[in-house]
Amino acid sequence: MSDPSEQGIPAPEGPANLIDTDYEVGQDNVEMSVGPFGLDIHNPVFAISGLTIIAFVFVTLAFQESAGAAFGDLRDWLTGTFDWFFLTAANIFVLLCLFLIVSPYGKVRIGGKDATPDYSYTGWFAMLFAAGMGIGLMFYGVSEPISHFSSSVAEGAGSADSWAPLGGAAGNNAEARDLGMAATIFHWGLHPWAIYAIVALALALFSYNKGLPLTMRSVFYPIFGERVW
């Protein structure tokens, strides 16, 4: 296994259980030049995702009306059929965060046993809001409940789009107001923070403690082994 620090991955401070792999960051990449621009791309990932995006854009532009109707129907079906899944999954993330806080796993130190924080709690909170959700909270904290409310009461007798978070409150202003606030709190309260925290924790653990590349695929290494690369 090559030295993680040589690949731009911070070496753990103190004892850490590194994962032994011969993979080196960028070993499967293809380097090329397009005019004055140099490209360094991961061949399988770039080819599959690039072709998928091109095909999607082409079909959408070629059949705009049909695509618009199809995407609208798909959105309505997904949000109407799997609303329970969205709510349940977000609640599971919150419960998982609470479990990690009170369980022995919460004592695992990111960066190794002897690692020390680079920033104070005040600095971390400032970065979380300034670079994370700050502008979203300032803007959508006001506009989102208004948008939800308007989508329920704007049309004639109060019919709402079926995908709106408060579609069932059509024609009832008081209920639309309450559900609009509830949907906004769900989108910007503890639930999104819990989702971000679990994903960030997984990335940090496998990179800073296990010595793997800072990518989502590293999280699946215990399951798929070398096939994740």
Model-predicted regions and their roles:
Residues 2-164, 171-176:
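N-terminal alpha-helical transmembrane segments of multi-pass membrane transport
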Residues 17, 37-47, 52-61, 94-97, ...:
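Helix-loop-helix module between adjacent transmembrane segments
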Residues 165-170, 176, 190-193, 203:
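Alpha-helical transmembrane segments and their immediate juxtamembrane interface regions
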Residues 169-178, 224-228:
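Short membrane-interface loop/juxtamembrane segments of multi-pass integral membrane proteins
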